[in-house]
Amino acid sequence: MTIAFQLAVFALIATSSILLISVPVVFSSPDGWSSNKNVVFSGTSLWIGLVFLVGILNSLIS
């Protein structure tokens, strides 16, 4: 169970880092938002899901 928690935290950190870089790039490009809207929404949905997963796994470990 600890391995799953550590992998979930790593995935959350990696997703946060990717979104931290990619979202401003998408917003600053001229046609970026209209062409990459689905990618931003799916990345945000993945991030929210990982936040809940880390919270659930944390409550099971503690």
UniProtKB/Swiss-Prot annotation:
Membrane topology: Multi-pass membrane protein
Gene3D superfamilies: Photosystem II PsbZ, reaction centre (1.10.287.740)
Localization per Swiss-Prot or TrEMBL: Plastid, Chloroplast thylakoid membrane
Keyword Phosphoprotein: no
Alphabetical GO biological process terms: photosynthesis; photosystem II stabilization
An example Gene Ontology CC term for this record: chloroplast thylakoid membrane
InterPro entries given in the database record: PSII_PsbZ (IPR002644), PSII_PsbZ_sf (IPR036512)
Residue spans crossing the bilayer: 8-28, 41-61
Extent of the signal sequence: none
General function of this protein: May control the interaction of photosystem II (PSII) cores with the light-harvesting antenna, regulates electron flow through the 2 photosystem reaction centers. PSII is a light-driven water plastoquinone oxidoreductase, using light energy to abstract electrons from H(2)O, generating a proton gradient subsequently used for ATP formation.
Family: Belongs to the PsbZ family.
Subunit structure: PSII is composed of 1 copy each of membrane proteins PsbA, PsbB, PsbC, PsbD, PsbE, PsbF, PsbH, PsbI, PsbJ, PsbK, PsbL, PsbM, PsbT, PsbY, PsbZ, Psb30/Ycf12, at least 3 peripheral proteins of the oxygen-evolving complex and a large number of cofactors. It forms dimeric complexes.
NCBIfam families: PS_II_psbZ
Protein name: Photosystem II reaction center protein Z
Taxonomic source organism: Populus alba (White poplar)
